[in-house]
UniProtKB/Swiss-Prot annotation:
A Gene Ontology molecular function term of the record: protein serine/threonine kinase activator activity
Taxon lineage: Eukaryota, Metazoa, Ecdysozoa, Nematoda, Chromadorea
TM stretches of this protein: none
Gene transcribed to yield this protein: mop-25.3
Region (Disordered): 442-492
Family classification: Belongs to the Mo25 family.
SUPFAM superfamilies noted in UniProt: ARM repeat
Name of one Pfam family that matches: Mo25
UniProt protein name: MO25-like protein 3
Length: 492
């Protein structure tokens, strides 16, 4: 970092003066917070807003542009005074929207300019790469110190409809850190002393806002609330899996209530969110348990008859996932089998017009129709028993022993180190020999494919024919009756 500052040193007194003013504003802002904390007084938001304006102008103003040298120093000055960042987040709810926007900008500025990824600008100076910037460890430590304030921000929500986007930007920065995200998902409404402060955790408070549709009616507000869900559950799949494994029953029930809501916008967003979870390859176990609930597919059938086209399309997307699943639960498989003809007729009637040129939607309907046409009404094998699992495991182990090479260690004496402790042999002391299996133990009745002769090849299989191991079966009539299962262990 010192080398970087030497290369970006600029001897412009005007720019240096502005940078020093910004650093002084940071220190002055810290003193204001400390004095008020000692007096147990409320923060004077007007004085704090003035200091924030000075710092924001020194960073983002075009007329008072600060050199990269001073921007690095200013960002590190914030990290050297973590109490300033903590107090800024503490007053985030009480200040005006314009000041909230500046606090958001400063937090993004600190994260970006203290990162480890840099690019060269037109003047040759190194500037951080905002697209691939990785937050530094010191910035993550500052965020973790502010975790209880962030929980309050997520739990209480936004002060006005025009500031919900600013709240989501703050939550996104907080959720990028794995430790902070896990702390948010584990929240149960307690403070740092494990004292119960809220009735529920911050995640369930987001559900409460969606249930209170009489208070939050604007489409932009509902869209931002669902974006909060996406920010929390799309950052780290391991943290999301932990939350789902411990709260899947309540979480799925809450989303079923949202799917059954009277607001078509909430229905559309809820179905899309569930579809995104099912499409995530890391959520295979969550998808299996959630899809086993018959109430979900009943809601899908219900919303296929909706008068709103967006709701119908999202329901078809979920139906496509159900018909593709080869291991549906018996109640789910039975429901689809009973209504297969009706579903086929519905998909054929509501398929998009080829003139619409919507390729993704056309492929969705075609794929759903194909799976419904080839639907097998017999119940699939569901949840294999423990005995079947052990039997298949022994069969795979036997096949692996018969068709793999055995590694034999050459008999080389081992000399102890200092005549006291035996040492492990070096890699060169192992000699790998090929031990061919006996003809009696090989499976002579099964042959996968025929020997192909390659003309002009010195390594042709025809030049080194395989020794006969039994009668050659006719093509496409291979019998698997010769395969014998190992005897069952009576001890199990």
């Amino acid at each position: 970092m010192l080398c970087l500052r030497r290369r970006t040193q600029i001897a412009n007194p005007m720019i240096n003066a502005v940078g020093e003013t910004a650093e002084q504003a940071v220190k002055k802002l810290e003193k204001v917070f400390e004095v008020l904390k000692d007096r147990n007084e409320r923060f004077p938001l007007t004085e704090i807003s003035k200091q924030i304006d000075v710092i924001w102008e020194s960073v983002f103003s075009v007329t008072h542009a600060t050199a990269p040298q001073k921007k690095y120093e200013l960002a590190e000055e914030f990290l050297n005074h973590p109490g300033v960042v903590k107090n800024l987040l503490m007053v985030f709810d009480g200040v005006q929207v314009e000041t909230k926007r500046k606090i958001r900008d400063l937090l993004i500025f600190i994260r970006t300019w203290t990162s480890n990824d840099f690019l060269a600008d037109a003047e040759g100076s190194l500037v951080p790469n905002p697209r691939q910037a990785r937050p530094s460890q010191k910035f993550q430590d500052v965020l973790y110190e502010c975790r209880f304030i962030m929980l309050h921000i997520v739990h209480e929500g936004y002060a006005g409809s025009d500031s919900i986007g600013l709240y989501n930007d703050i939550i996104r920065i907080f959720a990028e850190d794995d430790a902070c995200l896990m702390f948010m998902l584990k929240d149960k409404g307690t403070d740092s002393n494990e004292v119960k402060q809220k009735f529920e955790g911050c995640v369930w408070a987001i559900f409460d806002r969606l249930f209170n549709t009489h208070t939050y009616r604007g489409f932009h507000i509902l869209a931002e609330i669902f974006e909060t869900f996406e920010i929390i559950f799309s950052q780290n799949h391991e943290a999301s899996q932990y939350f789902f494994y411990n709260n899947l029953s309540r979480f799925s029930q809450s989303f079923h209530w949202l799917i059954a809501a009277n607001n078509f916008f909430i229905q559309t967003k809820s179905l899309r969110f569930v579809r995104d979870i099912f499409s995530n390859r890391y959520m295979a176990e969550v998808r299996r348990q959630w899809m086993a609930d018959p109430s979900l597919i009943k809601y899908v059938f219900l919303h296929l008859q909706s008068i709103h086209k967006t709701v119908c399309l999202e329901a078809v997307g979920l139906l496509n996932i159900f018909v593709q699943n080869p291991c549906n639960a018996p109640p789910i498989h039975k429901l689809i089998s009973i209504n297969r003809k009706l579903l086929l007729e519905y998909c054929r009637q509501n398929a998009p017009n080829p003139k619409d040129e919507n390729q993704a939607l056309d492929e969705l309907f075609d794929e759903t129709i194909t799976y419904l046409v080839n639907w097998n009404e017999e119940e699939p094998a569901h949840e294999p028993t423990a005995q079947d699992t052990l039997k298949m495991r022994s069969i795979k182990l036997k096949m692996r022993r018969e068709h793999t090479l055995e590694l034999v260690q050459n008999e080389i004496p081992l000399f102890p180190r200092n005549n006291l402790l035996p040492t492990s042999p070096r890699q060169s002391s192992f000699v790998y020999n090929r031990r061919l299996p006996r003809v009696s133990s090989s499976r002579a009745g099964i042959r996968f494919g025929e020997t192909r002769n390659v003309k002009g090849s010195p390594r042709s299989r025809s030049q080194s024919p395989r020794p006969p191991t039994g009668p050659e079966p006719s093509p496409r009539t291979t019998s698997y009756q010769n395969v014998r299962f190992p005897p069952e262990d009576s001890s199990r």
